[in-house]
Amino acid sequence: MARTAHIVRETSESHIDLELNLDGTGKTDIDTSVPFYNHMMTALGKHSLIDLTIHAHGDTDIDVHHTVEDTAIVFGEALKQALGDKKGIRRFADATVPLDEALAKAVVDISGRPYCVCSGEPEGYEFCMIGGHFTGSLVRHVMESIAFHAGICLHMQVLAGRDPHHIAEAEFKALARALRFAVEIDPRVDGVPSTKGAL
């Protein structure tokens, strides 16, 4: 059975059209109308091996927040949909990724219980403007939106870093690598990887 999803979300603030394939090769076609976010979501697709197509636009003349948030919401929903009954998945995964002086660690549990903990960001990171339009605070917001709408537990920890661009990119790549292994089918797993029998 194909582990894919296609979701279109239309509100007065944004239009999001997103497709993904969990069993892809990391092919991406990303246009969110927010250049730095394009860069981050392209990295997420590439390093998770999730084929990802996103065409999004919104009221970015006001602020990029709505488009960024809504894209993350739809990505989370699509991830949940594509996972289906979660039979055979590895479920747990972690990844630590460097980018020059920055180092980020992501730990994922595809548990069906949404939770997100972000820690370790340097003081003032949330106020930094990255790429001209994207604030550091949006990184945490993206992680929370993905986790809660995908129904996963995500711990994201910044272990080192000075450059806000490097920190953000390390976080997205760490999430990508953790998702790559968490969603992967393990041929040794029989059924749902839970003692309860459901996730």
UniProtKB/Swiss-Prot annotation:
Family annotation (CDD domains): IGPD
Transmembrane is among the record's keywords: no
EC number, as in UniProt: 4.2.1.19
A GO molecular-function annotation: imidazoleglycerol-phosphate dehydratase activity
GO biological process, any: L-histidine biosynthetic process
Recorded family membership: Belongs to the imidazoleglycerol-phosphate dehydratase family.
Protein name per its UniProtKB record: Imidazoleglycerol-phosphate dehydratase
Organism: Bifidobacterium longum (strain NCC 2705)
The encoding gene: hisB
